[in-house]
């Protein structure tokens, strides 16, 4: 009974960290709207928060795996949280710089540094959370089921982030980084609280193999893992790209109030929440391969419909005027709702891909998790590519980037994920 209680305590902590990752990471998308309007800059430059946050994964991915191998999951989580506290504090400071219009370069530079440091934290925590949930669940379908359960709370935190930021921004054309202070303070408080709780909690951990270059080579020698790492690289372009450019399109091109846009984009993450509930309930019965095959096909269908749906067919959607606390109805193109439904599909992609990619890796699992996290920097690359396409030919046509990513995930599920060899 004692061991069981300890295990559940570890599960609860890992799930709480999963939620924190979503809240802090998703601050970057509404912040991009603020930055674009405050600086009157292009879509490519407006994504500096996402670039900083996700490029950090490239730098920290493998070192994070090494930290786990050397110090264990608990100490590594504490290191990550300490770094996160610093990153959030720097982002907050960027909004406190006087005369932001005259010092725009300084404001954006400080914010970028803060986002980059916060990205270190997100990378480290991801390296801790995913393998620990997989291990605590017993691996296989059961491990995937526990990852999907953690994903439910991850999506809930994302929904809260967008609704909160929609309320804080109000009028996107006049918003400043300092308007996001309450959200940043919430994130800072959560980090501090989590640090204290984890420091006081005993977590039983599996033994880790010493980190050697041969371990990295050993993990990459597994074809299904190498292709899975690329799948995560491209998957990030779907998960973040779809809601990000819905927000930019509705705010910057259609001029829909930020309060309504925040509610709309929150629907995407609410769809992820629903999908993860479903994924958690059937994860022990349905294989990851079947899940990813199904949702990849659905993503292709939904994104293509969203791109080609007539823009003059409108659907009324309720938003909130947070100044007067009244409901405001806004006409939105029907294709936007197809994009939002993609959240149902992305809800199970991360856990499913991770589960397939680390299957049979044995002693290479810890370092493989670090390599996996490194590939999350694909979000920065895919955001840059999609933003460039959006600047060149428009927001809607930029979704061809998402179509390409979804097509690769379908290939990985059907062909690339098959395990050719197993380790003890």
Question: What is the predicted role of each segment?
Answer:
Residues 60-75, 275-288, 313-314, 390:
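Helix-to-loop junctions at the C-terminal end of transmembrane segments
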Residues 130, 143-201:
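Helix-loop-helix hairpin linking two adjacent transmembrane segments in secondary transporters
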Residues 82-104, 298-328:
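C-terminal ends and interior cores of transmembrane alpha-helices
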Residues 48-68, 266-278, 378-381:
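Central cavity-lining transmembrane alpha-helices of secondary-active solute carriers
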Residues 9-41, 126-130, 242-250:
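Extracytoplasmic
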Residues 28-32, 221-266, 274:
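Extracytoplasmic gate region of multi-pass secondary transporters
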Residues 124-138, 346-362:
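Intracellular juxtamembrane helix-capping segments at the cytosolic ends
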